[in-house]
Swiss-Prot record:
Keywords: Antibiotic resistance, ATP-binding, Cell inner membrane, Cell membrane, Membrane, Nucleotide-binding, Translocase, Transmembrane, Transmembrane helix, Transport. One of its GO terms (cellular component) is plasma membrane. It is an enzyme of class 7 (translocase). Its EC number is 7.6.2.-. The lineage of its organism: Bacteria, Pseudomonadati, Pseudomonadota, Alphaproteobacteria, Hyphomicrobiales. Homodimer. It is found in: Cell inner membrane. It comes from Bartonella quintana (strain Toulouse) (Rochalimaea quintana). ATP binds at G46, A47, S48, G49, S50, G51, K52, S53. Non-canonical ABC transporter that contains transmembrane domains (TMD), which form a pore in the inner membrane, and an ATP-binding domain (NBD), which is responsible for energy generation. Confers resistance against macrolides. PANTHER family: MACROLIDE EXPORT ATP-BINDING_PERMEASE PROTEIN MACB, MEMBRANE COMPONENT OF TRANSPORTER-RELATED. Residues 10-248 form the ABC transporter domain. The chain crosses the membrane at residues 285-305, 532-552, 593-613, 625-645. Belongs to the ABC transporter superfamily. Macrolide exporter (TC 3.A.1.122) family. This is Macrolide export ATP-binding/permease protein MacB.
Length: 660
């Protein structure tokens, strides 16, 4: 049973550490029992492979023993979670490494501040303390220098300042002079002596007996066993109770609350992500490229689908919206339709009196020619009522449209399409209104010009319009009508109106010798087809975005592999698993968000090209598609960045630190 002493800071009992080697295990530490008291300066000495570094890793909670028990200031570590061990490292230990392990993207000041960020220290306090520590260690003129601008001795001093940032009570120094020249090594040992004099517990791991002799106590280890534990000299530290009570102890300073601390760590992760992206600009751009292309394709395809739909709707207006067209026969392909004579002008008059009908026009047609001077063209002569133009949404851009009087008097008032001007009057800039043209054998006066083609541009045949009574008497020689167009009131459902019109005409004719074409049904089918086509093309674009996301994941896996040493350093100074996860997840999300933003701009620029080259269809962008695309790119970053980030957060600190 262990008897706890008040000044025991590190206590190991029966510690064993084994590593697997294929199907066998190698025992590196064998039944280690060791107690280090508060304020001691201890040197652990041994040859390479003796197990001294493994022992230091267990002392610093960078590694877990295979068996045995370990207490830190009376707290048992065996059942602690990864984040609880991080808290112990953050609050109790400061690490000085042989290879310094400074982050190349940060200045000396930034490297020293890292432990305080994870401790939740406010920016002002941690910056002041980091500056004071660097000045104290003779680095005041190198505060803003990066590691590659510092000598080995200067880098080790920055490492010592980082170890002191959270006022650690235990300093663990692994071969602190191993990579330094003699003068720099002596300077580092002098600093460690000063820290010991302040009352800190110093543990030095070394193979150099001259370095070990600076300690009060020398522990020799060989083949994983302690073979000697000698007191070299009497401690000359501050009296117990005075150690580590300096006014600069950040634990005695005001720290940030949970949310502000989280926000500060998030800000640090964001800055580090930007620095990492800037350090590998070409790789970052190539990673973004897949996201850029995917987002641009989605934005452009959705805009193209919207533009196509609007163009179709624009053309569809010329065919009449919310209208019913009644035709003789069972269908357009009915061979008996020409023999059906029951559709007459009286049907149109009866339909016009229905309360849900806002306009009715009979319709007849004939093929003929239109001639003006030496110009003669084939044309379709369409006979319509005065309400035809209203039902079809057509307006006069010149002159007027014929009225009820023109229909009643069988006038030869002709209305032509605007597109017909360049055909009939190719060299004239005068208004055609009032001019007489020859329609077949009938002279007709042009009274108006309508603004768009009734056939929606789907036929090259010229169409001209006369009162249907005129066409009946002068062109077809019959009083029958070939179609009746019914305009439904705006507040009435066209499908309901269709069923009521069908019942009404069946009652009049005694049978269903007609069929009805509902413009709304035609419109719905066109919209459905357009929507399906847009979804299909957008799905293909989305696949390219997913491929881009896979590229992000691949690069993030490479990034984790390249920065594995950085991960170990951050964990050693107290970063939680969630901090590491956040660090790399933010980087992946940032790549995708920036790529998404550039992709949106690229997608918008495609619309400019359509305008520049006067394409018949313009891309129509919506704020919804832009927001959805940006959200989708963010989700790509989260989904494809989570696995590499999680892999990074679950690394063992000792494994990460051992990688070059």
């Amino acid at each position: 049973m262990r008897t706890e002493q008040a000044d025991d800071v590190l206590v190991l009992e029966n510690i064993v550490r084994k590593f697997s080697a294929g199907e066998t295990f190698v025992t590196v530490l064998k039944d280690i029992n060791l107690t280090i008291k508060r304020g001691e300066m201890v040197a652990i000495v041994g040859a390479s492979g003796s197990g001294k570094s493994t022992l230091m890793n267990i002392l610093g909670c960078l590694d877990r023993p295979s068996s045995g028990r370990y207490w830190i200031s009376g707290k048992k570590t065996a059942c602690l979670s990864a984040d609880e061990l991080s808290a112990l490292r953050r609050n109790h230990f400061g690490f000085i490494f042989q290879r310094y392990h400074l982050l190349s993207e940060l200045t000396a000041l930034g490297n020293v501040e890292i432990p305080a960020i994870y401790a939740g220290c406010s920016p002002q306090i941690r910056k002041k303390r980091a500056q004071d520590l660097l000045i104290r260690l003779g680095m005041g003129d190198r505060i803003n220098h990066r590691p590659n601008q510092l000598s080995g001795g200067q880098q080790q001093r920055v490492s010592i300042a980082r170890a002191l940032m959270n006022n650690a009570e235990v300093i663990l120094a692994d071969e602190p002079t191993g990579a330094l020249d003699k003068k720099s090594g002596q300077e580092v040992l002098r600093i460690l002596d000063e820290l010991h004099q302040e009352g800190r517990t110093i543990v030095i791991v070394t193979h150099d007996m001259q370095v070990a002799e600076r300690a009060e106590r020398i522990i020799e280890i060989s083949d994983g066993e302690i073979i000697a534990d000698n007191v070299a000299k009497v401690a000359k530290t501050k009296a117990k109770g005075q150690a580590l009570q300096g006014k600069q102890n950040p634990k005695n300073q005001k720290t940030l609350g949970f949310f502000r601390s989280f926000a500060e760590r998030f800000r640090e992760a964001f800055v580090m992500a930007l620095l990492a992206m800037n350090a590998h600009r070409m790789r970052t751009f190539l990673t973004m490229l897949g996201v850029i292309i995917g987002i641009a394709a989605i934005i452009a395809m959705v805009a193209l689908g919207t533009g196509t739909r609007e163009k179709i709707l624009e053309n569809f207006k010329s065919l009449g919206s919310n209208t019913l067209t009644i035709l003789p026969g069972k269908s357009l392909s009915d061979p008996q339709s020409d023999k059906i004579t029951s559709l007459v002008e009286a049907d149109a008059e009866a339909l016009s009196r229905l309360p849900y009908v806002s306009g009715v026009t009979p319709q007849v047609s004939a093929s003929s020619t239109v001639r003006f001077g030496a110009v003669e063209v084939d044309a379709v002569i369409v006979g319509v009522g005065e309400q035809f133009f209203q039902t079809q949404g057509l307006n006069a851009v010149q002159g007027r449209l014929f009225d009820q009087k023109s229909v009643r008097d069988r006038a030869v008032d002709l209305v032509i399409e605007k597109e017909a001007l360049s055909v009939l009057f190719p060299h004239s800039r005068e208004s055609p209104v009032g001019k007489v043209v020859q329609v077949g054998q009938v002279p007709a006066r042009i009274v108006g010009v309508i603004d768009q083609q009734h056939n929606g541009g789907m036929s090259n045949t010229l169409q001209v319009y006369l009162p249907y009574t005129t066409v009946q008497t002068r062109f077809v020689g019959t009083t029958q009508v070939r179609a009746i167009t019914v305009k439904i009131a705006d507040d009435i459902d066209s499908h309901l109106a269709e069923s009521m019109v069908r019942r009404f005409l069946i009652m009049r004719h005694g049978e269903e010798d007609f069929f009805i074409r509902n413009s709304q049904l035609f419109r719905d089918r066109i919209m459905e087809s357009t929507h399906i086509l847009t979804l299909l093309v957008s799905s293909i674009a989305a696949i390219s975005l997913i491929v881009g996301g896979i590229g992000v994941m691949n690069i993030m896996l490479v990034t984790v592999s390249e920065r594995i040493n950085e991960i170990g350093v951050r964990m050693a100074v107290g970063a939680r698993q969630s901090d590491i996860l956040q660090q790399f997840l933010i980087e992946a999300i940032l790549v995708c968000i920036i790529g998404g933003g550039v992709g949106i701009l690229f997608g918008l620029s495609i619309g400019g090209l359509f305008v520049l080259f006067e394409a018949p269809i313009h891309l129509i962008y919506t704020i919804d598609s832009i927001i959805i695309s940006l959200t989708f790119s963010t989700l790509i970053g989260i989904c494809f960045g989570f696995s590499p980030a999680r892999q990074a957060s679950r690394l063992d600190p000792v494994v990460a630190l051992s990688r070059d």
